[in-house]
């Protein structure tokens, strides 16, 4: 009987050890699912992005990288600036682990720049802001990614960016808040958001910064036209907190470090009647 009890105890110990090992491996697999992070000094951090995959080499070697510190822009006045032709369309909200993204499932409209059309694909947020103005970073930055309707022409991508400082709630985020709350820590999960009108995002198309840069996440593809609103919108601290809670710990501050300007020109485009 003692032998049976001994065998049973020994067997139980082995089972527990195997179970613990299995859980440990599973936890390791979850951690390894992320391909990059924003943690300074991490093996997957921004300074290592260009070494993680061959196709991400531009993150390290590129000379036209984003984000940048915007200072001393060249003033440009014009009668015709950015034109928005957005329209309401069904969308989904996706927790990508490193950010929260709204992706429109159909034709959500486009923007016109120099008589060229770029379709709106998705929008996502970074906190704090990725770009800076004279060394100042803001509480949050929204990116709206657009792709050219003619892929044979360059640039093929345009990102419209909006800065936010802490203040009144942002109406667009308020509408999406309940869905975002349901996606907290639900990496790679998405939910239908119904019909979302991009016009609800308060853009300033009469005064904006413009320069040529890159995507701010791997693969850091260059040749991206950046349109950054000069006007600063507001967002509540609770809304920023929600965006940070929804993603993994490694992405609560999901802003890439500032990149070298490398003699690129930054322009400030304002309508001829604009006074600011």
From Swiss-Prot:
EC number: 4.2.1.1
Keyword Transmembrane helix: no
Glycosylation (residues): 134
PROSITE patterns per record: ALPHA_CA_1, ALPHA_CA_2
Domain (Alpha-carbonic anhydrase): residue spans on this chain: 34-270
Pathway named in the protein's UniProt entry: One-carbon metabolism
Reactions catalysed: hydrogencarbonate + H(+) = CO2 + H2O
Source superkingdom: Eukaryota
Cofactor: Zn(2+)
Keyword terms of this UniProt record: Disulfide bond, Glycoprotein, Lyase, Metal-binding, Signal, Zinc
CDD domains: alpha_CA_prokaryotic_like
Cysteine disulfide links: 59-220
Active site: 98 (proton acceptor)
InterPro entries recorded: Alpha_CA_prokaryot-like, CA_dom, CA_dom_sf, Carbonic_anhydrase_a-class, Carbonic_anhydrase_a-class_CS
Gene Ontology MF annotations: carbonate dehydratase activity; hydro-lyase activity; zinc ion binding
Signal sequence interval, chain numbering: 1-27
Function in brief: Involved in the production of blood-red nectar containing the alkaloid nesocodin and that serves as a visual attractant for pollinator visitation, including vertebrates such as Phelsuma geckos. The nectar is initially acidic and pale yellow, but slowly becomes alkaline before turning into red within 24 hours. Together with NEC2 and NEC3, facilitates the condensation of sinapaldehyde ((E)-3,5-dimethoxy-4-hydroxycinnamaldehyde) and proline to form nesocodin, a pigment with a stable imine bond.
PANTHER family the record matches: CARBONIC ANHYDRASE (PTHR18952:SF201)
Descriptive protein name: Carbonic anhydrase Nec1
